[in-house]
Amino acid sequence: MTKVIQTVSEMQQITQELKSTGKTIGFVPTMGALHEGHLSMMRRSVEENDITVISVFVNPLQFGPNEDFDAYPRQIDQDVALVEAINVDYVFHPAVEEMYPNELSVTLKVGRLAEVLEGAQRPGHFDGVVTVLNKLFNIVSPNKAYFGKKDAQQLAIVEKMVEDFNHPIQIVGIDIVREEDGLARSSRNVYLTDDERQEAVHLSKSLEIAQTLYKQGERRSHIIVGEIKTYLSEHTSGHIDEVAIYSYPDLEVATEIQGQIFISLAVKFSKARLIDNIILGSE
């Protein structure tokens, strides 16, 4: 039976007692509106740990002034039913007032890693992410925490935060979960119109084109970026926010591709901004 915990003090007490008896804890932080991408991380945690805790908390600190905080889907009963079916032990579901009873006097600020890609598009976003994660890690005290590779920049930042702040936590990156037609699973996919949903499949197809070019030996970033942009402009009505290639996980601009690289794209449809990526050179 999955238990829903709503206070910081109770969650801390539970996890401290579990740790004192030698139990290992896996943690999957989410903002709810769960989909198969989230569930795949939770299944992995259930396999690898004695206890699995997830959080469902829509964190206001990571939303900008013109972003969809109020509109972000909230469906806690449905989320709990989903995680109960895969044997998640605890859902930490605090109110905003519980997590932030007073205005924070101290927040974290991400440096260079947040100056590109999503961080450049959404100033302050990753500061909000690492601030809430720092709190959640202190509350849950997990042995392992699971993050999706769809948010690869976030994954790189979280790994660096854990290293910089000496959190004794292993960060586990989980491969992107996709629909049958290739669209990356996302809570924001529900905002797409029927026509946009048909077009959105071309995000992953454009990355397949990039992968083919890479395998054929193309190492000039501007050539690969140009091919992706041309394909997206021909096959979607969305606004191409960004197509970029960086080294990974250092997120340095890569004009000539060497080593492991990260191709990221973002396309803004009428009510949803979708991101997708592929990491190459790790094989």
UniProtKB/Swiss-Prot annotation:
Molecular function in Gene Ontology: ATP binding; pantoate-beta-alanine ligase activity
Keyword Acetylation: no
GO BP: pantothenate biosynthetic process
Enzyme class, spelled out: ligase
Active site annotation, chain numbering: 38 (proton donor)
Binding site for (R)-pantoate: 62, 154
Entries under InterPro entries matching the protein: Cyt_trans-like, Pantoate_ligase, Pantoate_ligase_C, Rossmann-like_a/b/a_fold
EC numbers on record: 6.3.2.1
Keywords from the named record: ATP-binding, Cytoplasm, Ligase, Nucleotide-binding, Pantothenate biosynthesis
Residues that hold beta-alanine according to the record: 62
Recorded GO CC terms: cytosol
UniProt xrefs under NCBIfam families: cyt_tran_rel, panC
Assembly and oligomerization: Homodimer.
Protein name per the record: Pantothenate synthetase
Native species: Staphylococcus haemolyticus (strain JCSC1435)
Lineage: Bacteria, Bacillati, Bacillota, Bacilli, Bacillales
